[in-house]
Amino acid sequence: MKSKIEEPSANGGEAIRFELAHLLGQLLDHRWMIVAVSVLFTLMGTLYSLFATPIYSADAMVQVEQKNANTVLNDISQMMPNAQPASAAEIEIITSRMVLGKTVADLGLDVLVQQDHFPLIGAGLSRIIGQKAQQIAVSRLKVPTLWDKRELSVEVDGPDSYTVSKDGNELFKGKVGQFEQHGDVTMLVNSIEADAGTRFTVSKLNNLQAIKMISNNLVVADMGKDTGVLGLTYSGEDPVQISRVLDQVINNYLYQNIARKSEEAEKSIQFLAQQLPDVRAKLDQAEDKLNVFRRKHDSVDMSLEAKSALDSSVSIQTQLNALTFREAEVSQLFKKDHPTYRALLEKRQTLDEQQKQLNGKISQMPQTQQEIVRLTRDVQAGQEIYMQLLNRQQELNISKASTVGDVRIIDHAETAAKPVAPKSILIVAGSLILGLVVSVGLVLMKALFHHGIDNPEQLEELGLNVYASVPLSEWQRKKDQETLLKRKLDARTDPHNRLLALGNPTDLSIEAIRSLRTSLHFAMMDAQNNILMITGASPGIGKTFVCANLATLVAKTGEKVLFIDGDMRRGYTHELLGAESKTGLSDILSGKLPFNTDLVQRGDYGFDFIARGQVPPNPSELLMNSRMKELVHWASQNYDLVLIDTPPILAVTDASIIGKLAGTSLMVARFETNTVKEVEISYKRFIQNGIDIKGIILNAVVRKSANNYGYGYDYYDYSYQQGEKS
């Protein structure tokens, strides 16, 4: 019981080790592909690092002073799990449209100028060969908003002249420093530092695009928790421009902070600026009335009682006017239910009551004294108010000018001498690693999902005998490539240049077919006849190659061999042997030509050959004709071995018809091309038709590290080395 439990575990471990070894072998087999892909990726990474535009980085530092108020509450809030650092709000302000938008307006960043280069590599190539950078400065640009692409092409004509065009159509010619306006297009070029003929693309960005361009290249980070110090980094292609942009950003941030602090004073100054002209006008009017009254009444003098009432009334009126201006300021900060606002209203009410009492006393004086008191009071009160407003205006101006914000610039923008990107070493190393990952991944994916036969044991597991494993012949592969290059074969090709058994008889593939010849000698002893059918599951697996070379090797032993090309659809054996195909099997079976030995071709290949003939419309019906049986019977009587090359069984039924006439049948499967499932289905189809498949020939075997085991492979190596020594 114990052994039964342990046995699967052992087998499972062995299977895992086999799979790992198999995958490792796949990597070794495809090592040159892995190397090639890795080198390709590395080369691409190297080229990218050479041609990529260098990116520079400027950095600056600002300090935001911490507020001392509510220290305990601030400390408690910072202890909350979702608490944001105090600098988070300042970071948002720096990257806001308020700050960045003013930067765009100050520096004219909504106008983008780019030199035209050859796509992809032009800019990098110019930089590598040391070509001087070409540039023009455009400070003003206005184009119609309805344009799909709000850009113009500018070509330099000379040191101070240029030509502007749109979509290849010239719009106007301009001069440096001159404001050019033509139709809806307005442009001002400040300077040109470029050779004649240099082209530039000048684009007009909307405000949001320009702000986003800055925001994408701007990084603001807290330099430490609760330090209040912020580090700003801005990256771009122009090292001078990025310093200017970053400096302008921090200056605008500083200005908005100061403006926020002095906002109350600014509003008060604006209010006073509106009130002073009215107060001055009322004062002038009051002085004019007093002077007119005195001239009319010959400079009337006031009594002591009138002077006392006048002084009190002026004082009260001055306080009321001051409260009026104070109320105007307070109303912008507080509501009427605020204690400060209520206190102001209560004080006004008290002064109003005092003024009423005083007016009652004045009303008891003579009419002339009343009038002189009233007029004099208006003048003196107006003078007091006017002087108070002037003094207040000066105080507010001084307060505004001396306002210091919470922000302090610690370090102004500085650009590093060396570019921060691209990082050549990292790019090349990353490209190499990526190439390795991609190539290894492709190899492993192919190994996991490709189910082609790569081991004779896979066929033996189906119960089929593997009669031979024929190695892939490099000689034959080169000849096939030459054939593909020529596209059309010469019908009279020398078989020594195409047939492996004649052209290179010491090839390892021929040694394997010799072994097959020996195996067939004993396998066919008990067969009903000497007819050998060789078929396969699919086309392009090397059936004809095996048949032709086997026929040659058997003929060399002195036996009389007949090779019949039974593939009347796509048979090409006549091309391989340099024979004729005008007449052949199809003509015999269709009765177009009476059968005689003249139809049998003979050549330097050593065996007799019947070509496929003209391609018929009904090959299967012809094979079922009695003439086929008569031909096979005649061939069996007159030859020691008859080989019939047939079409693939999974494509057509010809092989199942011919197999009924053959005493021995073999299938050919191609290494890593045919799958086990294809062979299994083909084998079952033959069994259903009552045809016994004697065995399998595994063709085009390539020795691989993934399958570096088995007697067959060692045998080929051994034979090859012995051949070299002998």
From Swiss-Prot:
Query: Which Enzyme Commission numbers does its entry carry?
Result: 2.7.10.-
Q: Does the keyword RNA-binding apply?
A: no
Q: How does it sit in the membrane?
A: Multi-pass membrane protein
- Cite a single GO MF annotation: ATP binding
Which residues are listed as membrane-spanning?
32-52, 425-445
What is the catalytic activity of this protein? L-tyrosyl-[protein] + ATP = O-phospho-L-tyrosyl-[protein] + ADP + H(+)
Q: Which UniProt keywords apply?
A: ATP-binding, Cell inner membrane, Cell membrane, Exopolysaccharide synthesis, Kinase, Membrane, Nucleotide-binding, Transferase, Transmembrane, Transmembrane helix, Tyrosine-protein kinase, Virulence
Q: What is one GO biological process annotated to this record?
A: polysaccharide biosynthetic process
Identify the main location.
membrane
One of this protein's Pfam families, by short name? Answer: WZC_N
User: What GO terms fall under cellular component here?
Assistant: plasma membrane
* Pathway(s) where this gene product acts: Glycan metabolism; exopolysaccharide biosynthesis
**According to its UniProt record, where is this protein located?**
Cell inner membrane
What family does this chain come from, according to its entry?
Belongs to the etk/wzc family.
This chain's protein is named Putative tyrosine-protein kinase AmsA
Q: Provide the species name.
A: Erwinia amylovora
